[in-house]
Structures are given as C-alpha cells and as structure tokens.
C-alpha cells in the first residue's frame, strides 16, 4: 500500500527550491506535455526570486521569431536595486533546445494549444520554469474532474473506515 502525502513532483528532488506555482493552470487547462526551461534574467530578478517574490497566475509563453518568451510573469522589484531595478512583468526569454522550441511552436500555431508556466523554481542555483503544453478545459471537463475527485475522496474514506 502506498503512503499518503504529495506525489513526486518538481519540489521533491534534492537541490530544488520551488518559488511559485500556477495552481489555477491545472484547473483551467489540460496539460498534455511538460518541459523544463531556463530563464534569461537580470541580477535584480534573480535576487527577487531568491526572496520568493513571484507570481505566475496570468503568465503564458509565446513564440517570437525563433525564440520563446515568458510574458506576464510577475517578478516583484528588488528593494536594494533602486536605480538598476527591472520591470516586474517584462517579457523574459526562455532557454530551451532548438528542437523543443520548434516542436512546441508548431503545436501552438496549428492545434490551438497554449504554453503555460506551471512551476517556477531553482535547480542547483539556476532559475528554471516548468512549462506545460496545455489545452483549455470546457465547463464539462471541469465538472468531470470535480466528480472524479469527489469519488476518489469517498473511496479513500470508505477504505479508512474498514
């Protein structure tokens, strides 16, 4: 029998520190694929992330030319940077292999997928983002997910009572 608790994810590995999660994305979208990407950041952005000042709730990624950019990700300003501070919601270049960028860009352009950031974290001192290739859920899909979750809870309760 398996033990309770969280499933193995990004934050359960050694050397990984989760900064921000996009919990709303898992409710609004069906995630078909995931990939890890690096971020091109300024020094004040890295320091803000180390302080945990980030929000991914409205963020998404878009292809521009041969590159992918993370847009609307809010990395708060770093107090000590004053003059050299960054814009909180500026576009940030995503660092991925050329083949991955081309494959994901093709899927986004032809099949109605979106690229949504799921988790922002540090892995061995480097800022990374877990991106999901997502398709929007319909109202019926959301209801189905809620119903599945409820039946699973009821089964767990029944098993504990035995």
From Swiss-Prot:
Required for rescue of stalled ribosomes mediated by trans-translation. Binds to transfer-messenger RNA (tmRNA), required for stable association of tmRNA with ribosomes. tmRNA and SmpB together mimic tRNA shape, replacing the anticodon stem-loop with SmpB. tmRNA is encoded by the ssrA gene; the 2 termini fold to resemble tRNA(Ala) and it encodes a 'tag peptide', a short internal open reading frame. During trans-translation Ala-aminoacylated tmRNA acts like a tRNA, entering the A-site of stalled ribosomes, displacing the stalled mRNA. This is SsrA-binding protein. GO terms for biological process: trans-translation. InterPro entries: SmpB (IPR023620), SsrA-bd_prot (IPR000037), SsrA-bd_prot_CS (IPR020081). GO terms for molecular function: RNA binding. Belongs to the SmpB family. It comes from Myxococcus xanthus (strain DK1622). Residues 140-162 are annotated as: Disordered. CDD domains: SmpB. Its main location: cytoplasm. One of its GO terms (cellular component) is cytosol. Keywords: Cytoplasm, RNA-binding. The keyword Cytoplasm applies. It is found in: Cytoplasm.
């Amino acid at each position: 029998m398996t033990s309770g608790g969280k499933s193995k994810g990004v934050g359960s590995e050694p050397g990984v520190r989760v900064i921000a999660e996009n919990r709303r994305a898992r409710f609004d979208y069906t995630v078909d694929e995931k990939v890890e990407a690096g971020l091109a950041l300024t020094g004040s952005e890295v320091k803000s992330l180390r302080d945990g000042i980030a929000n991914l709730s409205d963020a998404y990624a878009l292809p521009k030319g041969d590159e992918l950019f993370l847009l609307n990700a809010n990395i708060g300003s770093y107090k000590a940077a004053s003059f050299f501070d960054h814009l909180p919601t500026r576009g940030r270049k995503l660092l991925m292999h050329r083949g991955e960028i081309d494959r994901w860009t093709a899927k986004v352009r032809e099949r109605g997928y979106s690229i949504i950031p799921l988790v922002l974290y540090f892995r061995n001192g480097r800022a990374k983002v877990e991106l999901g290739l997502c398709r929007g859920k319909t109202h019926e899909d959301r209801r189905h997910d809620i119903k599945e979750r409820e039946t699973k809870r009821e089964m767990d309760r029944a098993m504990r009572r035995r």
